[in-house]
């Protein structure tokens, strides 16, 4: 099913809102994000404004999935959300990301949003007092979060951000996994899932991602399959119903929707296959485990 969020404003209006959020000082209650971004060093695009507003659409929401295509700035969108939580003094914030992206996240937060962060690593250990002090944003790898899930769960996180959240897509399976440990550890926290590929192999993966946010959103897996996988309904009707159900929790922007104001460089990709030697793969696995 294609998840496509309708944009109720013209491109000119969205450009104005993007400028307003980026440049204005202060702001009334109606302009929720204006004050947060008044000092942020970032040029916003209209679709990023829409994504940030979507994330705050309901005070009762347990979280959302931002599923823009690659290259549309999901990190910036998450930065806006994180900044708003920080401004509201909801400062127990954890970002779970691939190990290779932790430094990038730290730099983005500092350079674009002036937010301090600390990367949790095995060699540094964990202090529960520090995790709860709300003085900085914490960043860790998926492997670290999985290994330290019990300790991390003792902090009531105001916001947990999952970058490359498709890594959690198989959480619906009955076998214990990294995804199931993280789901349990942060079940009570507000969550923001970032992924360009919310659906890769089968529709159950979409069920899994949504269950990370709200375990009861679609009911149990058996009911979900009966309604959307093995339904007697016409496929168009079933997928139409699924899109309607996903609309409050999943926001997706496609590249073709933003070509009016985002100019892409024409590239000719060349793929070069590489197969690591046994020793190289072993070293890579050991470093990943250490991180």
Language-model segments: which ranges?
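Charged, low-complexity intrinsically disordered regions
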Residues: 1-20, 206, 279-291
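SF2 helicase/translocase NTPase motor core
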Residues: 4-53, 74-77, 81, 86-178, ...
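Phosphate-binding P-loop
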Residues: 54-61
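Walker A/P-loop
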Residues: 61-81
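Conserved Walker B
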Residues: 69-70, 164-168, 196-198
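Conserved phosphate-coupling serine/threonine residues in phosphotransfer and NTP-handling enzymes
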Residues: 98, 195, 277
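Inter-lobe coupling linker of SF2 helicases/translocases
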Residues: 138-157, 173-188, 212, 216-291
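Conserved helicase ATPase motor motifs in RecA-like P-loop NTPase domains
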Residues: 189-200
């Amino acid at each position: 099913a294609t998840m496509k969020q309708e944009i109720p404003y013209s491109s000119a209006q969205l450009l104005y809102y993007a400028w307003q959020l980026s440049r204005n000082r202060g702001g009334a209650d109606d302009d929720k994000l204006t004050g947060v971004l008044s000092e942020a060093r970032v040029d916003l695009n209209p679709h990023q404004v829409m994504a940030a507003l979507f994330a705050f659409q309901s005070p009762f929401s347990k979280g959302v999935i931002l599923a823009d295509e690659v290259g549309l700035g999901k990190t910036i969108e998450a930065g806006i959300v994180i900044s708003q939580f920080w401004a509201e003094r909801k400062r127990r914030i954890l970002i779970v990301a691939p190990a290779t992206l932790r430094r990038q996240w730290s730099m983005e937060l500092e350079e674009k949003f002036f937010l301090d962060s600390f990367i949790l690593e095995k060699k540094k250990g964990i202090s529960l007092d520090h995790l709860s002090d709300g003085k900085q944003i914490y960043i860790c790898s998926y492997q670290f979060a999985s290994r330290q899930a019990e300790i991390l769960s003792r902090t009531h996180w105001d916001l947990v951000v999952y970058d490359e959240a498709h890594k959690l897509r198989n959480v619906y399976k009955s076998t214990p996994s990294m995804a199931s440990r993280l789901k349990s550890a942060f079940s009570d926290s507000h969550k923001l899932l970032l992924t360009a590929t919310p659906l890769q192999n089968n529709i159950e993966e979409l069920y899994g991602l949504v269950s990370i946010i709200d375990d009861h959103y679609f009911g149990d897996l058996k009911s979900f399959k009966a309604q959307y996988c093995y339904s007697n309904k016409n496929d168009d009707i079933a997928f139409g119903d699924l899109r309607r159900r996903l609309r409050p929790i999943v926001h997706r922007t496609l590249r073709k929707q933003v070509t009016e104001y985002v100019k892409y460089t024409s590239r000719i990709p060349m793929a070069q296959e590489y197969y690591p030697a046994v020793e190289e793969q072993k070293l890579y696995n050991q470093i990943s485990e250490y991180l």
